[in-house]
């Protein structure tokens, strides 16, 4: 075994895989430490990728040069476009994944990747010097691996405990090993830890459930994919359906009669669980007025014999879980392969991180994923990619990649984590992004592909394909502006017959697209440049034309905000010397130590008056470093 690496990544989940691949692809000698060789990028909870905001993150990962989108496309059982009846700012792609094939795909990518070693041992601690600079890790056999940077992506394995009713025992997900020594190292380094919780529902045997009364939830009959490079699509007739059922009054009564047996309500658990993915008993307590709740029955893999009971996670003891399951319609004879459980684990306070995802007070140590207080595979993968990129760039002496809130949902997430902190597992939502009309599902490439190319993760071939992609959009918009249709044209007749539009005079194709009721597919046969475009390209054209005024106004606002990002705050500033700064603002600014005025303005507890005082102080004390208003 080698003993010296550039980058060591601890944990082979979704964050760890992206971090390790990014580092290795940037020519860094990289080690990925994982407890099991066959458990890479597993899906211990929901067997799906994407969804509102999260699906856009997957496309952002792809645009930057990550792997998740390709894996999700290659192993999709069903593909669905969500929120299509609403505004384009909240459209989102979601795939039901074959979890076994997804993990196998990522294992193969890891094994084939140059510069990357997979080491199946436990990390028992961090090696660091007296200056709080991490220099490597300890393995379970007391071997030391040296590194220039270490990235911790331990997910829910960090000092984790499984909870079922009053039963509580040390374990990782699915009764796998847990990781304990790293927590002690973090505490010894002065890093503040928190305790969070999540949970997962039961897996039930397919042949024990009758879904004849369930509502079928099919995929979307469109050529949809996460990755820019995906060119093959699973036809709708070959996609696997999901099913929708509802809990019953009996289910509710079982919960109410046994609430004190739940780990959540018996006092066994004091840690905080995810607000947007609550246990079923949580739903019953929090929404007392509701007698029933939605439950989705989802396939996990074509190679298996189980259903995933989405929306039915619980920390009830097994005997109560059985009653709960058998109260569901079609589940009267259900047999269970894996029971539901809650899991409690250590994570850090992310306000201790810099925007690069390196710890502020510990050099060469990066963290990504659920250890940073987030939930979800996509959030983890996005952080892992950024951590892997920035660890590599630090070794090369380059500035970190820091995505702004107007550039990416990944930027929104990291900015929220480091400036606002978390008090419950953080989940990305479209409502967290103030510029969501700019952060759309269709335009991840045009937002971020340039970054991916400059970083070094986009190949020459993919870059050439992207340039063609952009040129095709530009050519189509040009042609739409030039071509005109009279009221007697075949297009006008078609639109009138389908009650999409009544062209009373001559219109350009561009003007026709502006009509909200018009489907761009009606124009395809009349405009040659539209015929070769992908779904995402067509969506981009419609949105850019139809929402032209809104997009322009949003970009003007962003231009003003970017100026605040350029106003740097010196690292040696003493906030106690800033006159008329509120006490809370001083405390928060000192703790977070923002890099610029834009970041400072987004910190909870720092108000506009505080920012004005800070600007005044900077102009006075650092006249050569501050930027003019």
From Swiss-Prot:
The keyword Magnesium does not apply. PANTHER family: GLUCOSE INHIBITED DIVISION PROTEIN A, PROTEIN MTO1 HOMOLOG, MITOCHONDRIAL. It is found in: Cytoplasm. This is tRNA uridine 5-carboxymethylaminomethyl modification enzyme MnmG. FAD binds at residues 11-16. The gene is mnmG. Transmembrane segments: none annotated. Homodimer. Heterotetramer of two MnmE and two MnmG subunits. It holds the Pfam family GIDA. InterPro entries: FAD/NAD-bd_sf (IPR036188), GIDA_C_N (IPR049312), MnmG (IPR004416), MnmG-rel (IPR002218), MnmG-rel_CS (IPR020595), MnmG_C (IPR026904), MnmG_C_subdom (IPR047001), MnmG_C_subdom_sf (IPR044920). One of its GO terms (molecular function) is flavin adenine dinucleotide binding. GO terms for biological process: tRNA methylation; tRNA wobble uridine modification. Signal peptide: none annotated. It comes from the Bacteria. NAD(+) binds at residues 273-287.
């Amino acid at each position: 075994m080698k003993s010296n690496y550039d980058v060591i990544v601890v944990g082979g989940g979704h964050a760890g895989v992206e971090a390790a691949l990014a580092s290795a692809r940037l020519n860094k000698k990289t080690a990925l430490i994982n407890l099991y060789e066959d458990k890479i990028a597993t899906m211990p909870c929901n067997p799906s990728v994407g969804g509102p905001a999260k699906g856009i993150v997957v496309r952002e990962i792809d645009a930057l040069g990550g792997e998740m989108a390709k894996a999700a496309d290659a192993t999709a059982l069903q593909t669905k476009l969500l929120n299509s009846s609403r505004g384009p700012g909240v459209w989102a792609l979601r795939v039901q994944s074959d979890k076994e094939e997804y993990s196998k795909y990522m294992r193969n990518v890891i094994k084939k990747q140059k510069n990357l070693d997979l080491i199946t041992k436990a990390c028992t601690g961090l090696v660091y010097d007296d200056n709080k600079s991490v220099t490597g890790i300890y393995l379970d056999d007391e071997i030391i691996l040296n590194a220039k940077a270490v990235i911790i992506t331990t997910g829910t394995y960090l000092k984790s405990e499984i909870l079922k009713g009053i039963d509580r025992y040390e374990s990782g997900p699915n009764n796998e090993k847990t990781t304990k020594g790293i927590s002690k190292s973090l505490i010894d380094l002065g890093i503040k830890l928190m305790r969070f919780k999540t949970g997962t529902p039961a897996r039930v045997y397919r042949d024990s459930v009758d879904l004849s009364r369930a509502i079928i939830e099919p995929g979307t009959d469109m050529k949809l994919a996460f990755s820019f490079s995906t060119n093959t699509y699973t036809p709708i007739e070959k996609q696997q359906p999901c099913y929708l059922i509802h809990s019953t009054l009996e289910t509710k009564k079982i919960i109410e009669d046994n609430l004190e047996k739940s780990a959540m309500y018996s006092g066994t658990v004091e840690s905080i669980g995810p607000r947007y993915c609550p246990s079923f008993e949580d739903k019953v307590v929090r929404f007392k007025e509701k007698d029933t709740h939605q439950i989705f029955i989802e396939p996990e893999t074509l190679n298996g014999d189980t259903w995933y009971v989405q929306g039915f996670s619980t920390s009830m003891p097994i005997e109560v879980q059985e009653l709960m399951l058998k109260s569901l319609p079609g589940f009267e004879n259900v047999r269970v392969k894996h029971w539901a459980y809650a899991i409690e684990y250590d994570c850090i306070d992310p306000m201790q991180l810099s925007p690069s995802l390196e710890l502020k007070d510990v050099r060469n140590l990066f963290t990504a994923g659920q250890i940073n207080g987030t939930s979800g595979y996509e959030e983890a993968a996005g952080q892992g990619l950024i951590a892997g990129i920035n660890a590599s760039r630090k070794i090369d002496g380059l500035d970190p990649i820091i995505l702004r809130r107007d550039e990416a949902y990944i930027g929104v997430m990291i900015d929220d984590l480091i400036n606002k902190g978390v008090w419950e597992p953080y989940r990305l939502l479209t409502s967290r992004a103030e510029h969501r009309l700019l952060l759309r599902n269709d335009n991840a490439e045009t937002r971020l592909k340039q970054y991916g190319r400059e970083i070094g993760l986009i190949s020459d071939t993919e870059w050439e394909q992207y340039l063609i992609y952009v040129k095709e959009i530009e050519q189509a918009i040009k042609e739409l502006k030039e071509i005109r249709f009279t009221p007697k044209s075949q297009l006008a007749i078609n639109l009138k017959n389908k009650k999409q539009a009544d062209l009373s005079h001559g219109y350009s194709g561009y003007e026709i697209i502006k009509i909200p009721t018009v489907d761009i597919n009606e124009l395809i046969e009349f405009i040659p440049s539209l015929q070769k475009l992908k779904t995402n390209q067509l969506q981009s054209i419609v949105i850019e034309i139809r929402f032209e005024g809104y997009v322009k106004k949003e970009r003007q606002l962003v231009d003003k905000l970017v100026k605040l990002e350029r106003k740097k705050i010196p690292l040696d500033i003493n906030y106690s010397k800033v006159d008329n700064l509120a006490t809370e603002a001083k405390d928060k600014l000192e703790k977070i130590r923002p890099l610029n005025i834009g970041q400072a303005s987004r910190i909870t507890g720092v108000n506009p008056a505080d920012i004005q005082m800070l600007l005044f102080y900077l102009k006075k004390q650092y006249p050569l470093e501050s930027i003019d208003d």
